Amino acid sequence: MKIGGFQKTSLLDYPECISAIIWTMGCNFRCPFCYNKQIVLGDAEEMPEKEILSFLEKRKGLLEGLVITGGEPLLQEDITAFAEKVKKLGYPVKIDTNGTYPEKLKELIDKKLVDYVAMDVKAPKNKYNQLTGAKTDIFKIEKSIEVIKADAPDYEFRTTFVPGLLKKEDIVEIAKWLDGAKRFYLQQFKNNSPLMSSKLDNVAPYSKEYLNETLNEIKPFFKNCYVRGV
């Protein structure tokens, strides 16, 4: 596993769980609003996998889970083997994904190696390439959504609401696409760290009022629907 970041404790990233977080290096997207630029480009200092596993071993009974984020964790060839090691230590695993590897995601779910999946739905279908900075196979995105809704033990979908790239109508389109999903988060755009595209560095986030107005329009499509990051 190419691990480029590690946080020993988080109360926010795994719902109702005190977790540690690792960031895997590399991503097949170049989302202009991404704030993990070093991780995505593989420029972060790599951490030994055994160091993470040793920490988890020592923190048994104190930590309640591990979040594997990135980058795109499912790019890692040994993600399955790593998840197996973490599960053997007794930890629930949350994986963040962009949805471009539905087969690998299903394998992890079928092998009971993931307990919570968070998938970023970047845009409505017609804007996906623009929001990801890459040519995207929408079939794979759709397949991942299908797998998560049908098979994931627990899950959330989420969209970062980027001013100038997405507006309320786009979020409504995403909500229609995900209709019936258990949980959705509308995430506030943040530019307090270097972004993939410097063009967004001085873009102001949408107001709390506009986020809540958008939230009220999409609530009927989800069992649970929230704003995050305001």
Whereabouts are the PLM-identified features?
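N-terminal [4Fe-4S]-dependent radical SAM core
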Residues: 1-23, 30-41, 54, 58-62, ...
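Conserved Rossmann-like nucleotide-binding pocket used by diverse enzymes
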Residues: 23, 69, 185
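Conserved functional loop/turn residues at catalytic and ligand-binding sites
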Residues: 26, 35-38, 90, 113
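Glycine-rich phosphate-binding "P-loop"
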Residues: 38-44, 65-68, 72
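Flexible loop residues that form catalytic
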Residues: 39, 71, 122, 189, ...
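Glycine-rich, highly charged phosphate/nucleotide-binding loops
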Residues: 45-55
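Conserved AdoMet/S-adenosylmethionine-binding subsite of the radical SAM
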Residues: 53-65, 74-214
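A C-terminal junction/extension of Radical SAM enzymes
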Residues: 210-230
